[in-house]
Structure formats: C-alpha cells, structure tokens
UniProtKB/Swiss-Prot annotation:
Description of how the protein assembles with itself and partners: Acetyl-CoA carboxylase is a heterohexamer composed of biotin carboxyl carrier protein (AccB), biotin carboxylase (AccC) and two subunits each of ACCase subunit alpha (AccA) and ACCase subunit beta (AccD).
Compartment(s): Cytoplasm
GO biological process, one term: malonyl-CoA biosynthetic process
Coiled coil: none
Native organism: Paracoccus denitrificans (strain Pd 1222)
Major location category of this protein: cytoplasm
Listed SUPFAM superfamilies: ClpP/crotonase
PROSITE patterns reported for this sequence: COA_CT_CTER
A Pfam family recorded for this sequence: ACCA
Listed name of the protein: Acetyl-coenzyme A carboxylase carboxyl transferase subunit alpha
Amino acid sequence: MTYLEFEKPLADLEGKAEELRALARKGEGVDLEKEAAALDRKAEEMLRDLYKQLDPWRKTQVARHPERPHCRDYVEALFTEYTPLAGDRAFGEDHAVMGGLARFKDQPCVVIGHEKGNDTKSRIFHNFGMARPEGYRKAIRLMDVADRFRLPVITLVDTPGAYPGKGAEERGQSEAIARSTEKCLQISVPLVSVVIGEGGSGGAVAFATANRIAMLEHSIYSVISPEGCASILWKDAEKMREAAHALKLTAQDLKKLEVIDRIISEPVGGAQRAPAEAIAAVGEAIAAMLGELAGKKPAELIKDRRQKFLAMGSKALG
C-alpha cells in the first residue's frame, strides 16, 4: 500500500500491527495478536478521522493516488463484450485514451476514458493519461459511431490535462479539444460522465460535456492544477494548498455550484483501499444516470445538455 504524505502516522500504526503479527506467526508472543488487533482498531479510527477532514489539497493527493482504480479497471469490471477502437484515421493512435463498443448491464453502448497506467512502463505507454490530438479525434470518431447507431455514451475522466508537448500543439491540440467538446454537445444520444480521479482542464471537459456528470467523493475537477495555478498567480508552486482551496475543485464544492449532478461515495480511505467497492458504486451511479435519461427524445437530450452548460455559473453569480 502506498501512503500519502498526510497518512504517515497511519502508515506507522499499520506497520507496527503487521510487525506484531509477524512475530506472533513465529510464536514469539502469546498476546501479540491481541495487541495487533488493538492497533488495527486505532488505525481504522485514525483513517476515518483523516478522511473526514480532507482539505482540497489533500483531496488532490487522494485523487492522484497511483493505486486508485483506473479506466481499464472500470471497463473490465463493469462492461462486457468490450471491443476497442484504435486510431483517429488521420494521424495515429493515442494510448492515453481508450474506448470502444461494449455492453453495460446488457445494454449496448460506447465507453471512452483516459487511461493513466499502473506502473512505470504502462504510465509511459499511456503518457500518464495526458491525451494528444489523436486521442480527442478518436473520441470524436467513437461519439459519431454512437450517434449513428443510437448508443449511449459513457465517459470516464482521469487526466492531469491534455498533453502540452510541441508535437501535440503542432497537430492542433486546442482545435481537437474544442471539436471533442463540440461533438459532446451535438450528439443526440444520452451522454453520462464520471470523474474517477483527476479532471484536469480542457482535457477533461472534452469528455465531460455531458447530460449527467458524477464525481467520486475524493476526485477533483478544475481548470488548472493547483501547482499551475500557484505558479501563475503567486509565482510560487509551493502555494498549491491555497490554490487548491481557491479553485473549488472538490466534488463537494462543484455539487454546490451545480457543475456536477451527483457525488459517488468512496470507501473509507478512498477508492484505492477498496477498488471493487468503488467500482461497484460507479456502476450503480452510471445505471442511475442512464435511467434518468431513458425515454428522452434526441432533441430533448441535446437541449438538456446545452442548457446545462449555458446555465453554468449562474449559481455562483446569484
């Protein structure tokens, strides 16, 4: 288990409990198992207390936790008959974006998401979930397929942001993001989105301009990273805590501002501690959101989506 900076006291406690268990297994103490169990109870209590008082910066750390379930984990657990589509038919394939045809609870659909990878090799292969223009154009291609065959679209967002490299900019990164966002607003089928980790900038919006948007309890969604914001506003990346607070990037803040529609509860300690439980909760939320849109006519779906985003910000402005 990888522990975050603020979880260090918890790591010490759980480490001591494991040491006692190791000694008990060797037969070096009769009551060590009881002592270990007592430490476990203290650790559980500490874990609950820590996650009850997460500030925006700590939530950012949790959202980035390397052991949180990623897009591929959700697809493998929640979807059947997944058939991936590759390439944008213009330049090439982008492994930061995965997507294809599938079935969700026996209903045919199209699923699209950012994939970060889960170890050094796969993270490099998937470019840490930072999509290039080809990824957004692949998503457009998939949304066109969904629109043609009247299939709902489900997107899973988990990206620090679109890739800012020279090659990506030369191939039209901003145009690709804009076209993907435009396509989200144009398709006449249900579109639901879940932010499962990081929802960074236009790279996230390009997949999440949806009829219904949900966020996991400890995920984040913002126009820029806290570090980037701090560097621009205060010329000091170390002010990321203040920036995280100012950005209103938590699911709780965004629900109040009516940017998102629902918050999906995570297991105590975050999705990384009980991935199967978190994945099941996301599946239930997707089913509920699709149920809300069932029976709506194509024109109603488009109107619903556009009005949702045109009205965005009215809550904050009063």
